[in-house]
């Protein structure tokens, strides 16, 4: 018996190490650390193969191998986590991730130390090899990352989040994108999904400031990649991203030719100048570069022989011709789209910029519908371009005028422009309060959500999601009656509309007071219907919202009445890891409230599924499975004490 058990156990360990090796090949900022761990474990393979093939066996050896098995499970879970989680998260939370590696290393070292090597029939060479592994593990326990993390990468990511408007930000974005290998549409989509998973796996808890940081950094990387690859298909990112962002088609925003964009700011040049290296830059950008003490050309790294800047009149003329041929107003000096390190101060805006905004504000109040429509459309595009524009437009008093346009029922296009302008302005954190409180925009946005065109309703939902990032806004939005029309959009909207409604509802329902409103608005039946329609592509979002609602008394009652237990058990049986953990989270609430759900779930065969999930699920899934197993165990004990019947006996009587 011991021999057979030892053989199977050794083979299991071999398979685990090989699986860890395959996981460690994934692209991640922790790749080097993963590879080190995998390499050390691979040195154990010859010993395990000999143990598997040897005839001799003992319970002491088997027990030691069981300890190794547990430590390998922890190692596999960690590497799987690192390979699937957000890359930006791994950089920003590097200390937290390193603690996890230290813990796994400690567990491996302890497990390998108790193996009775003197009782194993293995060669001295193999014993020395295992001893080498132990030495390497102990040595790594004394380190806290060392060369695993690139300090420059960490500082660059922090600088991108702080976003102080540096003209050299594009260089930092390039470095970060290249080091994190976020240079293609596939890379960006996966990173967006990883961030969205972090929100979903929070189980209703506010993801917090760290999520906001990661979202902001990802948006800057995405904007950079799209600038250099203007033909990228953005649709998957727009549907899946957890960032609030502009909803205009690429055709609404022409990408200038590369030679017309400053190599530093990556924006259309308004005052191009030539430096001694022969390269052309935006005057203000290269001026700040030189004032920062740099003596080389940013593009060629060639030493600049002088700081003389010669106006490039030919290029300026070509830029003006390109703008005219594409129906774009030629750039003025200085241009409203030009970033500035003082963008947060409206008083520093150039006169031309101020005059341009004032002209648009006058059009917004015009009695002519065409003027209002064109002004709202232009503000929509300007607010999409960069944060400087968003700050300047909001500071000028444009938001209340845009809010007034939300209730215009006879001009759907103006209404779309207005709500999308507010969406784009809301991306700037400091504008959120102005939109919600200073301008009282929420009732108007809700009106659009109820009465607008499908595009306007979609963007209204996206706006509410953006604004609800602030906790106080969740209360205001819920009190304004936004939840019922969001439920309606989730039920009958387009695919993008459903996604927008789901993300907004998820965010709003994090606040306890909104959960009851959502239940009373009929959200639970809509979610249950979407769960049974896999082609809707809304399973992940529906389960995430159900996990939040089921923590509310009304939510538990409604979910239980919807005959949800069989559906949830099916997802635990065959769903994705995220679906399994959210289904288990819902069942934790249901089964703590109604014992009939316990009996029904066990009758459906949930016990084996939970045991498997407790061993091999995600971290959150393991916790939820353990909670359910504990609940089943306590209920069974109670029934035995009171009636002498176990849970299985009760099931047989049903």
From Swiss-Prot:
Region (Disordered): 329-352
Domain U-box: 255-329
UniProt-listed Enzyme Commission number(s): 2.3.2.27
Comp. bias regions, Low complexity: 337-349
PROSITE patterns, per database record: ARM_REPEAT, U_BOX
Catalytic activity: S-ubiquitinyl-[E2 ubiquitin-conjugating enzyme]-L-cysteine + [acceptor protein]-L-lysine = [E2 ubiquitin-conjugating enzyme]-L-cysteine + N(6)-ubiquitinyl-[acceptor protein]-L-lysine
ARM repeats (start-end): 387-427, 430-469, 471-510, 512-551, 553-592
GO MF annotations, alphabetized: ubiquitin-protein transferase activity
Pathway involvement of the protein, from the record: Protein modification; protein ubiquitination
Keywords: Repeat, Transferase, Ubl conjugation pathway
Gene Ontology CC, one term: cytoplasm
One BP annotation, GO: protein ubiquitination
Pfam families reported for this sequence: Arm, PUB10_N, U-box
Role description: Functions as an E3 ubiquitin ligase.
Protein name in the entry: U-box domain-containing protein 12
């Amino acid at each position: 018996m011991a021999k057979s058990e030892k053989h199977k156990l050794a083979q299991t360990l071999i398979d685990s190490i090989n699986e860890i090796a395959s996981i460690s090949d994934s692209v991640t900022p922790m790749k080097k650390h993963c590879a080190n761990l995998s390499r050390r474990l691979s040195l154990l393979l010859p010993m395990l193969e000999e143990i598997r093939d040897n005839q001799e066996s003992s319970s002491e050896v088997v027990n030691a191998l069981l300890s190794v098995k547990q430590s390998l499970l922890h190692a596999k879970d960690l590497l799987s986590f690192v390979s699937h989680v957000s890359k930006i998260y791994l950089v920003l939370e590097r200390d937290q991730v390193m603690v996890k590696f230290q813990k796994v290393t400690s567990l491996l070292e302890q497990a390998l130390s108790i193996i009775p090597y003197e009782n194993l029939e293995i060669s001295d060479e193999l014993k020395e090899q295992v001893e080498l592994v132990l030495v390497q593990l102990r040595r790594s326990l004394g380190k806290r990352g060392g060369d695993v993390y690139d300090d420059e990468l960490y500082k660059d990511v922090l600088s991108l989040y702080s976003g102080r408007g540096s003209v050299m930000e594009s260089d930092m974005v390039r470095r970060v994108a290249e080091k994190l290998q976020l240079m293609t549409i596939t890379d960006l989509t996966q990173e967006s999904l990883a961030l969205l998973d972090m929100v979903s796996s929070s189980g209703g808890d506010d993801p917090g400031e760290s999520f906001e940081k990661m979202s902001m950094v990802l948006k800057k990387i995405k904007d950079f990649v799209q600038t250099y690859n203007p033909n990228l298909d953005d649709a998957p990112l727009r549907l899946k991203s957890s960032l609030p962002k502009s909803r205009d088609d690429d055709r609404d925003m022409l990408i200038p030719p590369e030679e017309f964009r400053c190599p530093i700011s990556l924006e259309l040049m308004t005052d191009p100048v030539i430096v001694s290296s022969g390269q052309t830059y935006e005057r203000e950008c290269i001026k700040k570069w030189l004032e920062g003490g740099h003596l080389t050309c940013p593009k060629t790294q060639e030493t600049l022989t002088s700081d003389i800047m010669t106006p490039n009149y030919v290029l300026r003329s070509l830029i003006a011709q390109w703008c005219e041929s594409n129906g774009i107003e030629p750039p003025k000096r200085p241009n409203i789209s030009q970033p500035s390190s003082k963008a947060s101060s409206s008083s520093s805006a150039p006169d031309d910029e101020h005059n341009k905004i004032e002209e648009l504000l006058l059009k917004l109040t015009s009695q002519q519908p065409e003027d209002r429509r064109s002004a709202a459309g232009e503000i929509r595009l300007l607010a999409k371009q960069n944060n400087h524009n968003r700050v300047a437009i909001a500071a000028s008093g444009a938001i209340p005028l845009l809010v007034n346009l939300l209730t215009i029922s006879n001009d759907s296009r103006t209404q779309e422009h207005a709500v999308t302008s507010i969406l784009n302005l809301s991306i700037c954190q400091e504008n959120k309060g102005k939109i919600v409180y200073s301008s009282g925009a929420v009732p108007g946005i809700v009106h659009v959500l109820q009465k607008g065109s499908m595009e306007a309703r979609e963007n209204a939902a996206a706006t509410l999601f953006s604004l609800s990032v602030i906790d106080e806004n969740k209360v205001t939005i819920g009190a304004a009656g936004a939840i019922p029309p969001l439920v309606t959009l989730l039920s009958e909207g387009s695919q993008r509309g459903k996604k927008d409604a789901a993300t907004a509802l998820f965010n709003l329902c994090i606040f306890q007071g909104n959960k009851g409103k959502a239940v009373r608005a009929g959200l639970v039946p809509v979610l249950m219907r979407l769960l049974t329609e896999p082609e809707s592509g809304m399973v992940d979002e529906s389960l995430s919202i159900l996990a939040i609602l089921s923590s509310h008394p009304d939510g538990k009652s409604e979910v239980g009445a919807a005959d949800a237990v069989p559906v949830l058990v099916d997802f635990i049986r065959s769903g994705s890891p995220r679906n399994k953990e959210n289904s288990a989270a819902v069942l934790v609430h249901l089964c703590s409230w109604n014992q009939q759900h316990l009996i029904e779930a066990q009758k459906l065969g949930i016990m084996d599924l939970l045991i498997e999930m407790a061993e091999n699920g995600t971290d959150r899934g393991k916790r939820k499975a353990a909670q359910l197993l504990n609940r089943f165990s306590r209920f069974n004990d109670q029934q035995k004490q009171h009636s002498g019947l176990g849970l299985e006996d009760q099931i047989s009587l049903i």
